[in-house]
Amino acid sequence: MATPRLTRNSQQQNRISQGSNSRQTTLLDWKVKDKAGNSKSVLEESSSLEDSNHADDQTEDALQTAVEYFQKGPKKASLSKDSVLEKHLKTVENVAWNNGLAPEAIDILLNVALSGKFGNALSTRILKCMIPETHISEDSVVKAVSWLCVGKCSGNTKVLFYRWLVAMFDFIDHKKQINSLYGFFFVSLQDDTLCPYVCHLLYLLTKKENVKPFRARKLLDLQAKMGMQPHLQALLSLYKFFAPTLISVSLPVRKKIFFNNSKNLWTPALLAVKLRNQGIFPEPLKLQLGPTSGRSLKRKWNYHSVIPAVNSAKKECREKMSLFDYLSNDRSLPVEQLQSFPQLLENIHCLELPSQMSSVLNSSLLLHYVNCVKDESILLRLSYWLSQTLQEECVWYNMNDYQQEKEFINFLDMVIRVQCFLQEGFYSCEAFLYKSLPLWDGFSCRSQFLKLLAWIPFSSFSEIKPLLLDHLAPLFFTSSIYFKCSLLQCLKDLLQNWLLWLSTEAQVQPMTDSPLETTLGGSMDSVSQLIEYIGWLSMVAIRLESSSTLLVHFILDFYEKVCDIYINYDLPLVVLFPPVVFHSAFLSLDATILNQLCYIMYRYRDNLTAAKKKDLVQKAKSEFSISSKICKEFNYYLTALVHCLWSSRPFETGVYIDPQIIENTGETQYKHNLNFVHHPCLLNYAASFLLQESPEEMPVHLSSIRGKKWNWYLDHLYSEGFQGLNLFIKSSIDHSSVSKTEKNT
């Protein structure tokens, strides 16, 4: 039976028409510039276009002849002796690497390669040029896998086929039948040579229903036999994610790159297919066969070309649906027909996701779907793609090229928007940061790097300190105050994301069931250590920047989040700021800093009171008990504030100053110098209050603010926006002492 003619698909025709349109547009532009020779140029351009179409037809005929030859040709032939065979093989290679092969051609050539009818050398060359023009039929892959059971191909051919299958995974139009072969692939793990590549394929295929106890036991046996191999750890981690009770061994908590794709033979070809599918360029992209080198990756970055367009997996093969597809009750909605959020809600049960899952990142509607459905396999595939993109596509990134930097920033901004939308950080971004931070100068892509840092998933402090904080600390100490403030804001956002995750996990499921294998107490220890580390950074920064008002404001902004952990997040943790932070804020010359400090003290008091009440009511079941050290520290801060601001009795507890030193200053009324009236940051408010009360009195006497005027002055401060002072006074000062204070002041 003759092989049907391998015609180009509609997408290739569209590409040719796009090329025609682009030529016409260029011609019109040129026509305006040079009207004299336009007729001749039009004829030449039309002639060249006709020649190009004629050449395409000749190439198509040559490819059809070559494919028919391989399908019907002799069973055994030598490349060195058979010139016809070599000619047809070169034809297939040239077409594959320039334009890609149609699904029908791939179907035939896969059978030829895996049947071994032409020998191992030719099978290897055919597999290396199996590059799709647009997509690969699932039926072709299933038939190719069936040849593995016959034993006609060599071990090297099997390895190359699995490598090809992993590389082309996203271009296969369906995965249902391939997933039904999961058991066959799993059995192939017993082959030591195939094991790394089969693990990679299974990592892409595995769903929750594929995780079975006998398979978990087999993986554990393989690990005991082969040791802690990265590919086995990857599959075990995935199994443990879906079924934590089946995997009892400890695995690395930190996600990493388990599979090395740096030797992927088809990396340039895959990029060309993505660009071609989106119509980025009309002309074929000539690529070199072989592994990708670092130099060849230094191409122009364009994040639109990295992320494929949203297209249904069945878009290219709607006309070839089987009888089973027509009779099936499962009517899926192609993603390209999804136009509105109500339409998403109506079809959320039958939405057909694209085979290239990374295209989801460019669709807000599909991100809504990912967020609602919570399908772990989708997130895993997204994370896998992002991991490979960041680790391999971005290693060539040149910071001295402004255009590349701008496009790279746009790509990172897109990733950040997706993480904010999903309210979840990708482990692949975390691995990228850990790899990049040791080389980061603290300036390039600063905003993007810090935003990515804020979405690092929760983990123990002992793990992130050497990977993250130890690299950030030198930059923090040696950079400008603006970098210090930006990093403090980033760490505040990181803490907030951790707290939200922990509070949600504590409500949804016990912490012992979480993927991090940690108890609530262990999680709180990590959060506490992070806060204490940031407190240490703050103390050093205050000394380096001479208690800068801007810096102290960002530090207190961080502790506004810390002081409300118990009440706002329902987590058993209270951590106070260091004394250096307290005294720098209290002695600041900026009134807003003092107001912010009083508000934080008010919130600390509420959190400690709530924790104490719960501890007394449920003493036997108490989640935690407040240490006496925390209570003593808070009481010291509280007493210092009340004595200085209200009672005018500073330096009575915790601080001792030699009376001779005070006498040498010549200041006899020093006890009043830090109260609400005489505090350096409040002097202008006190003077303004007196001028409003008695405009004719000059000069003003601050000592006159006593008795009723004291209360009026406080009301004046409240009207100026000092609500932190107001809340602190109402919550921490005994109102029975007001009359006594009025007399003493």
Curated annotation (Swiss-Prot):
Residues 39-50 have a biased composition (Low complexity). It is found in: Nucleus; Chromosome, Centromere. Keywords: Centromere, Chromosome, Nucleus, Ubl conjugation. Residues 1-27 have a biased composition (Polar residues). Residues 1-58 are annotated as: Disordered. GO terms for cellular component: inner kinetochore; kinetochore; nucleus. Transmembrane segments: none annotated. Sumoylated. Sumoylated form can be polyubiquitinated by RNF4, leading to its degradation. Desumoylation by SENP6 prevents its degradation. Its main location: nucleus. Belongs to the CENP-I/CTF3 family. Component of the CENPA-CAD (nucleosome distal) complex, a complex recruited to centromeres which is involved in assembly of kinetochore proteins, mitotic progression and chromosome segregation. May be involved in incorporation of newly synthesized CENPA into centromeres via its interaction with the CENPA-NAC complex. Required for the localization of CENPF, MAD1L1 and MAD2 (MAD2L1 or MAD2L2) to kinetochores. Involved in the response of gonadal tissues to follicle-stimulating hormone. This is Centromere protein I. It comes from Rattus norvegicus. The lineage of its organism: Eukaryota, Metazoa, Chordata, Craniata, Vertebrata. The gene is Cenpi.
